[in-house]
From Swiss-Prot:
A GO molecular-function annotation: metal ion binding
Alphabetical list of SMART domains matching this protein: Elp3
Chain positions recorded as GTP binding sites: 14, 64, 95, 155, 253-255
EC number(s) on file: 4.1.99.22
Protein name in UniProt: GTP 3',8-cyclase
Catalytic function, reaction form: GTP + AH2 + S-adenosyl-L-methionine = (8S)-3',8-cyclo-7,8-dihydroguanosine 5'-triphosphate + 5'-deoxyadenosine + L-methionine + A + H(+)
Listed pathway(s): Cofactor biosynthesis; molybdopterin biosynthesis
GO process terms (BP): Mo-molybdopterin cofactor biosynthetic process
Organism: Campylobacter jejuni subsp. jejuni serotype O:2 (strain ATCC 700819 / NCTC 11168)
Pfam families from the UniProt entry: Fer4_12, Mob_synth_C, Radical_SAM
Cofactor(s) listed in the protein's UniProt record: [4Fe-4S] cluster
PANTHER family: MOLYBDENUM COFACTOR BIOSYNTHESIS PROTEIN 1, MOLYBDOPTERIN COFACTOR SYNTHESIS PROTEIN A
Length: 320
């Protein structure tokens, strides 16, 4: 079992398999060029899997594959199968923008993937092109349909932004309901790589908009994640509300970047590398680094909206 110095059980590992993305979303990585790591600096899937096996043996129970856009990483389904074959009951998920999903969903399911989160910020083609700086909507919608047709469990992620998609929150909720998928509205998380003029909606503003049509009822708050679950009449949806709902006291996660950096907190600059250890096949050393990262995991993150602090690490490096 993995326990940090504050007594928190750490059982959730988020793995960014690539920094690359085929979108240029305003809230994440709107400008180019980027400081991508050279390919040789990235851990191979075999190297990542050496660490994943050790992490599972130490107590990791949930793994999420992120990016960048993870479907840009060649042979991702092979990596998924490695993990699934090693521990078939692991809670294994992917977060994707959905653009390539139609082509890869079947392979991912056959490899053992059971669920995924898909970004969907708008149902309007013009807005989608503005947000992603690319004509993406038809491909994303096709990817959603393909995943659902394969009986993969789908959650839709929507970053709620003022003057961009705030007039679509109800229609997005209704779209998700029609697809029998859960939608999760996300408070915009400030970071130094986002377009500077963006303004996000807070939880109460999201609820206020949805309340124009629906009776909104709080069902529960997840004590291990910044998500609150609500009902709009008979439909359950989520709000990921890091501004409004501090969950540091029960945080259960660490992050691994594509180049092998173990990151204790999204809003914490310090990180340690497992690259040398796994490339030598030294699992004992990798586990010792993991334990040191847990000792370094802060009690609270350094993010304060009041103090106008933002993340200096790009989310495309860590998966958000």
């Amino acid at each position: 079992m993995l326990i940090d110095q504050f007594g928190r059980k750490i059982n959730y590992l988020r793995i960014s398999v690539t920094q690359r993305c085929n979108f240029r979303c305003l809230y994440c990585m709107p400008k180019i060029p980027f400081d991508y790591q050279p390919k040789e600096n990235l851990l191979s899937f075999e190297e990542l899997f050496l660490f994943v096996k050790a992490a599972i043996d130490e107590g990791i129970e949930k793994i999420r594959i992120t990016g960048g856009e993870p479907l840009l990483r060649k042979d991702l389904s092979i990596f998924i199968k490695m993990i699934s074959d090693y521990k078939s009951d692991i809670d294994l998920a992917i977060t994707t923008n959905g653009f390539l999903l139609k082509d890869f969903a079947k392979d991912l399911k056959n490899a053992g993937l059971k669920r995924l989160n898909i970004s969907l910020d708008t149902l309007d083609h013009k807005k989608a092109k503005t947000l992603a700086q690319k004509d993406v909507l038809d491909s994303v919608l096709s990817g959603i349909d393909e995943a659902l047709n394969l009986d993969l469990k789908v959650k839709l992620n929507t970053v709620a932004l003022k003057n961009l998609n705030d007039d679509e929150l109800i229609s997005l909720l209704e779209f998700a309901k029609s697809k029998k998928a859960q939608i999760r509205f996300i408070e915009f998380m400030e970071n130094t790589h986002a377009y500077g003029k963006l303004q996000g909606l807070k939880r109460d503003e999201i609820i206020q908009i949805l309340s124009q049509k629906y009776q909104i009822q709080l069902i529960k708050k997840d004590e291990k994640a910044p998500v609150s679950i609500y009902k709009a009449d008979d439909y359950e949806f989520g709000i990921i509300d890091p501004h409004s709902h501090e969950f540091c006291d029960s945080c259960n996660r660490i992050r691994l970047s594509a180049e092998g950096l173990l990151i204790p907190c999204l809003y914490f600059d310090e990180a340690l590398s497992i690259k040398e250890a796994v490339r030598k096949g030294d699992i004992k050393a990798a586990v010792e680094i993991l334990q040191e990262v847990l000792r370094n995991k802060p009690e609270k993150n350094k993010w304060s909206v009041v103090d106008n602090e933002t993340s200096s690490r790009a989310f495309y490096q860590t998966g958000g």
